[in-house]
């Protein structure tokens, strides 16, 4: 993991030195000297590692690690110096001009002090650089250097890849179904060359599965020529061609050309084309990292009429999804199910007999170990092999309690570690930081997309790209980590976008170990041992900390934290906050904290504050001093009003104050807004405003906040209509708009709204006297929710042709007896029909809503039978009937009922009902 280590040292410093505040403030002379020397050091360290710093000798390894550790510590010092400088600059510039002369001496003193500190850092950098050069030229060091070699992890993994061709049967679990599917694709009758990509995270069994297929008799009989080529991460295309030629000739039992190693690129291509031109061949390219390989190699693999196939394994979804040609496809590897994982582990841990497991009472702890592997075949097999030598329950329990240590130190688990490090080292530097930051969260924690993105932005992990919003860049980072199988998507929203992620247990263990080694992240949990944990935090200075158990005032003594997360419901005291002046992100979501200390406002660098789902009732009075704050999330907290002076937080981008009214006794006031503070409309950079009471000043000036993309207002009154529409028409980037009237009889006057082209999600709660004329202009709309509209006319005609509509929710939206869906709604996947008290019939014409997957019918008591035409919805997966009439339910209950044949194609049908004993549901599926 040398590249990662260099990145976290010198790479971090170079990134920090791009800070624009510094460059604008007249101290860039020291910076230029730093950057030049650091670039030389970076090249030296990378070259040293390449020639022997990867573990070839103890001397080179220790020197390498020492130099990098020193530069990493300097990086942290520079970050702190810059933050301190930013504090002084802001204090000076924010003064009224009349007071600047008074504060000028203090500002100049601060600037001089910072320049001195940077000068001292420069001296330290020069000292480290001189030490490197001195040791590099020493005789002992030169003797220790070896000729250039490939990365140790990569070489080890390549050997394992080759050995997969000689798999043992007890390693093959859970492959029958995917094997049959893939062989069927390889043997398909299409004459053109087809590429089949097998994609999955490192250690998921891609290579084992592919090797089993490659060696199968059906494949051997079908193809004339075969080649298995393991692709080095730093491959040379000529070497790939030579390996391929050797494989083809060896499989054909033919003499390998004597001149092979003297041939150049063109001759190698010609020889391959000549050999394969009239043959049906299969090539397996194992462990492909980039699409660039295909661009280079495809010219040598003839696309003839004989049905040749290319199979490749990759960890990267971008590689698997590349357009390789007509008929090409990808197969995503699924992790092993619980029973399959147990079989594989048992085969390795108890090769003689499972009886040993039972007689020695090992099964409970063994199953816990298997559970930690979360279906990852490589981890299961490696751990099973290691445990096969351990006979006593105490030994097994020790391994379970120290699994993180075992992964990083036990030689028998080296392959697991090496494969994961290969994926990690391949990440660009910004993605390395973002990935390791995810190890802050507890194992199996559900990490939400927006939360991650905003925390990354607060830490300045997101590299600026001209013309692209930081949110979009961060989103691309997240997608890239998913494509590379470093994060797993565990929740998608109905619109096909990832909503929540998790990190595989094994990857999390390794990521956390790297984070601790790099003094980047640390966790304070049940594995932390009181004084030792405190000493670790104080002495090693990790920048980001997650507290996962109850903390005492003296349990954390670090002062240089940039992130503090509390992921525990235990009681916490905030005595440590006064010492955390460098904090950039404070996340207390779902913690037991009920009061914030006044010292919070001294955290000048704070950019992200998450108080959602806490018991906090108010923010400090001087909250406006947090001038760098970008995100404030008080969702589902007890905060009803923001403090005065909020308008001074000019950098604020996300203001999220949505609250549920837990004690409401009606179907209307279930959402509570936050009371608006004066001048809040002066927050010109605000992008998210969710959710606020509609008050006259805000409504009239809302149009000043032209960067808003998400707006949620409650307590809207009829007289707001014209001003509200005028303001909204000035905002051209709205993607989410939610308007709720003050009560269910108060009309929403929104006919004059015209700036609707950008809206993707629209929720209107309030009486509509007519269908807005602009409904049919919502060409980008994916969600439409109408609640309490009480329309006398059918709105369906105005929205049925909207091309991107995925989710439609009607809640007491229509007063007529008949709801008819004609041709249209071609992309609709979710339909909700709720509380239509006059509704007696729903008709779905043939061809309408062809893609519908979920249908909810709730509290429509007048509806006595399922929608006519429901039998035509062949993609419908779920039908939910909630508090509907007994007549409707009985018509589809059980075989032989009147309408049973119309719903028999639906996999899941559920009926929800209430009795005096509570709420229940039953399945009506066949």
From Swiss-Prot:
Effect of substituting residue 307 to E: Loss of function
Protein topology in the membrane: Peripheral membrane protein
Renumbered residue ranges of the record's region Leucine-zipper: 10-45
Binding annotation for ATP: 200-207
GO CC aspect terms: endomembrane system; extrinsic component of cytoplasmic side of plasma membrane; plasma membrane
Mutation effect (residue 211 to V): Loss of function
Mutagenesis / variant outcome for changing residue 766 to E: In rps3-4; loss of function
Phenotypic consequence of residue 43 to F: Loss of function
Protein location: Endomembrane system; Cell membrane
Outcome after substituting residue 494 to L: Loss of function
Free-text function comment from the UniProt entry: Disease resistance (R) protein that specifically recognizes the AvrRpm1 type III effector avirulence protein from Pseudomonas syringae. Resistance proteins guard the plant against pathogens that contain an appropriate avirulence protein via an indirect interaction with this avirulence protein. That triggers a defense system including the hypersensitive response (HR), which restricts the pathogen growth. Acts via its interaction with RIN4, and probably triggers the plant resistance when RIN4 is phosphorylated by AvrRpm1. It is then degraded at the onset of the hypersensitive response.
Similarity annotation: Belongs to the disease resistance NB-LRR family.
Subunit architecture: Interacts directly with RIN4 via its N-terminal region. Interacts (via N-terminus) with RIN2 and RIN3 (via C-terminus). Interacts with TIP49A, a protein known to interact with the TATA binding protein complex (TBP). Binds to MORC1/CRT1. Interacts, via its NB-ARC domain, with RIN13.
Protein name per Swiss-Prot or TrEMBL: Disease resistance protein RPM1
Organism expressing this protein natively: Arabidopsis thaliana
